[in-house]
Design a protein with these regions (language model features):
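Alpha-helical transmembrane segments of multi-pass membrane transport proteins
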Residues: 1-237
Length: 237
C-alpha cells in the first residue's frame, strides 16, 4: 500500500509538471510550488498531532498484556461456537483497534498471539492466517483510525464526523466476519476443531478473566472515543 501511495503521488506530480510545462523553465515549474504549498498546509494541521498519541495509547495497551488475557478469555467464553478461537481473534482485533488505530499493530500482535494458538489447536493454517489478516484490517474503519485522521487532514473534513460515520460500519464488518467464520467452521469442522473440555477452567474463572481483561479497555474506549464522539474533546486533545 505504501508503494502504491508513492506511485500515485509520482503520477500526480508528473501530470502536473506536464500541464504547467513551459519551455526554458525546466526547474521553475508551478507544480513544485503547488507540491510544497499543499504539503506544508497538510502537515501544519493540528489534527495530525493525535497520530503519535494514539500510537502511544496502543503501545501502552499492548505492553500491559491486556490483549493477551482478553483473547484467551474470549476464546473460553465462546468455546461452544464453531471456530471459537477464530471468533475470539476477530473480537479481540475489533476491540484492540479501538485502542490502537493502526493496522500494522493489530496484525503484528494478533499474528504473534492468536496464530500460534490456533495452529496449536489444529486449526488450518490458511484459515487462521485469513482470520488474522481480516481482523487486522478493521483498524482502518474503527475509530480512532489513523487513516481517518490523515484523510480528514488532506480532505479538510471533520475527524469527528468521519469517526461517527465509520464506527458502525467497522463493528458491523467485524460482526459479518464472525458470522462467516462460525458458518464456515460449522459446515467444515475439520479446519477449526473444538477445544478439549478437560482443559477448560470453571465458569467463574472464565467470567472473572473476561471482566478483568475487558474492563480496563472498556474504560479507555469510553473515555477516549466517548469524549470525541460527544464533542467534549478533539482527537488531538
Amino acid at each position: 500500500m505504501l508503494f502504491r501511495s508513492f506511485t500515485l503521488i509520482a503520477m500526480g506530480v508528473g501530470f502536473g509538471y506536464y500541464a504547467y510545462f513551459e519551455e526554458g523553465n525546466l526547474f521553475l515549474n508551478k507544480i513544485f510550488y503547488l507540491l510544497n504549498q499543499n504539503t506544508y498546509s497538510v502537515m501544519e494541521n493540528d489534527v495530525l498531532v493525535a497520530i503519535p498519541l494514539f500510537l502511544f495509547m496502543g503501545y501502552v495497551v499492548e505492553r500491559a498484556n491486556i490483549v493477551n488475557r482478553l483473547f484467551f478469555s474470549l476464546q473460553l467464553a465462546t468455546r461452544h461456537l464453531p471456530g471459537s478461537m477464530a471468533v475470539a481473534a476477530l473480537a479481540t482485533c475489533a476491540i484492540f483497534a479501538t485502542a490502537s488505530g493502526i493496522i500494522g499493530a493489530v496484525v503484528t500482535l494478533m499474528g504473534l498471539l492468536a496464530f500460534p494458538a490456533m495452529v496449536k489447536a489444529n486449526y488450518h493454517r490458511g484459515f487462521a492466517s485469513g482470520v488474522i489478516c481480516a481482523g487486522g484490517t478493521l483498524g482502518i474503519l474503527i475509530p480512532p483510525s489513523i487513516m481517518l485522521i490523515v484523510y480528514a487532514a488532506i480532505a479538510e473534513l471533520s475527524p469527528l464526523r468521519l469517526y461517527a460515520a465509520a464506527i458502525f460500519p467497522g463493528f458491523m464488518l467485524a460482526g459479518f466476519y464472525m458470522i462467516y467464520v462460525v458458518g464456515y467452521a460449522f459446515f467444515k469442522p475439520s479446519i477449526a476443531p473444538k477445544p478439549i473440555e478437560e482443559e477448560i477452567p470453571p465458569t467463574k474463572v472464565i467470567i472473572l478473566q473476561l471482566v478483568t481483561s475487558f474492563l480496563p479497555l472498556a474504560l479507555l474506549i469510553l473515555s477516549v472515543l466517548g469524549s470525541i464522539l460527544l464533542g467534549l474533546a478533539t482527537p488531538a486533545e
